[in-house]
């Protein structure tokens, strides 16, 4: 079992990381050469960063923006419900539990929840003592970082998971625009991803990770792996690559990926820390930061997902909506984008920005993220707006530690497949599952140093 983190460890980690951050930087421009800029708004963006979290639906996390705050987006309106197995009605409600049980969200369960577009099978799919949780929604006080980012930048209220199924196929679509027909959490060997394509084009890219890099466990790609600690120093020095995917801590006592039943307060602290590091980076003015989730995790959403053109049978059906915010110095402020998007939209954006050939027809057809950019801020020479200062996340470590002591068992790990797959292919220095708590302590220390987190 991983060692639990303490407030002292967070503070000690902060001293060490602060000293490292004080070292001279190597420059203030992203790695990757002087490629030709395309015309249009994307030509003003040099650096793309994606933080993909785990297993939450749009209504579950951001639906209350409309229901309780009146925000003009496609959220909850009140009266949403599903039937329980006994025929009783379960209405949507405010969920007070930060660590709910993990609802089913595999291929078959997700399709049962969808039920041909009725979206009425969520409670039945999670039948049992915790079945009502899937109709629960969180509010601003529980998700302070996400809600402030949604206030400050562009919320995408029609960003769908790429697959109506679990984590791996959806993350494959972020990386490669396909899972090659894989419906479950299993490796796809030989997958050609955006990392391969950027490497061949001489454009820098990295998979920053806490305990495990998905690229390594998912399809055995081990080039460009960088530890999350290096992300903070790279951001401060202006040395982030052209494209980065940030993987949260998937396992152990430091898990901060938002996958149930991991504590969502650690997820808020991670988001705040990443945003603060990016906002303070010399690269912020020409950056696009995408915060999204891989899939809905079995939680209710009222929007029936659409279909697209796809060569693999069954994969033309998109998954449920996931919470997504696009941030950056040139992004529209306080906006809502309702264009149909999915994880492959990230690849479409990179393809058009860097003049790449689309990885496949799905990437070629996907809508890119250019509409998130403010036309007034993408004209050459225009001054960008400063980053929003996010209120620090108050993190009660004592409460988190108490919960882990009460819960942790070896068979509780929701990412067992990824951990086992990574163990088979990763060099020892990149397999850090046993260090999960210490790694997250170092990330929290960075967040505290940047003023994004207060540990108590």
Q: Across the structure, where does each feature detected by a protein language model lie?
A:
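N-terminal pro-sequences and low-complexity stem/linker regions of secreted or lumenal proteins
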Residues: 2-5, 9-456
């Amino acid at each position: 079992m991983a060692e639990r983190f303490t407030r002292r460890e967070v503070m000690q980690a902060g001293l060490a990381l602060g000293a490292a951050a004080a070292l001279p930087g190597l420059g203030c421009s992203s790695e990757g050469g002087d490629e030709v800029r395309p015309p249009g708004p994307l030509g003003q963006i040099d650096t793309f960063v994606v933080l993909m979290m785990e297993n939450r639906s749009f209504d579950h996390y951001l639906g209350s923006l409309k229901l309780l705050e009146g925000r003009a987006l496609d959220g909850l309106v009140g009266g949403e419900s599903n039937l329980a197995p006994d025929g009783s009605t379960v209405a949507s409600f405010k969920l007070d539990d930060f660590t709910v049980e993990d609802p089913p969200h595999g291929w078959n369960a997700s399709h049962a929840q969808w039920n041909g577009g009725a979206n009425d099978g969520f409670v039945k799919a999670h039948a049992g003592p915790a079945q009502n949780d899937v109709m629960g929604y969180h509010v601003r006080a529980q998700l302070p970082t996400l809600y402030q980012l949604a206030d400050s930048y562009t919320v995408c209220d029609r960003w769908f998971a790429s697959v109506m199924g679990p984590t791996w196929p959806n993350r494959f679509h972020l990386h490669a625009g396909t899972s090659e027909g894989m419906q479950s959490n299993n490796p796809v060997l030989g997958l050609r991803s955006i990392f391969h394509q950027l490497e061949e084009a001489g454009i820098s890219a990295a998979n920053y990770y806490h305990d495990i890099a998905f690229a390594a466990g998912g399809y055995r790609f081990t080039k460009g792996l960088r530890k999350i600690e290096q992300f903070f120093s790279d951001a401060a020095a202006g040395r982030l690559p052209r494209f980065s995917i940030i993987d949260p801590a998937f396992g152990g006592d430091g898990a901060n990926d938002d996958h149930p039943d991991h504590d969502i307060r650690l997820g808020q602290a991670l988001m705040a820390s990443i945003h603060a590091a990016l906002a303070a980076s010399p690269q912020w003015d020409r950056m696009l930061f995408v915060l999204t989730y891989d899939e809905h995790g079995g939680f209710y959403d009222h929007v029936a997902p659409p279909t697209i053109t796809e060569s693999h049978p069954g994969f033309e059906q998109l998954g449920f909506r996931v919470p997504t915010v696009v941030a950056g110095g040139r992004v529209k402020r306080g906006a809502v984008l309702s264009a149909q998007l999915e994880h492959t939209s990230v690849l479409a954006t990179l393809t058009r920005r860097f003049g790449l050939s689309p990885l496949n027809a799905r990437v070629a057809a996907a809508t890119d993220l250019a509409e998130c950019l403010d036309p007034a801020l993408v004209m050459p020479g225009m001054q960008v707006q400063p980053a929003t200062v996010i209120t620090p996340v108050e993190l009660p470590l004592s409460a988190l530690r108490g919960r882990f002591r009460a819960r942790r068992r070896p068979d509780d790990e929701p990412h067992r497949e990824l951990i086992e797959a990574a163990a088979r292919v990763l060099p020892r220095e990149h397999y850090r599952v046993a260090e999960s708590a210490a790694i997250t302590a170092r990330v929290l220390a960075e967040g505290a140093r940047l003023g994004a987190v207060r540990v108590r």
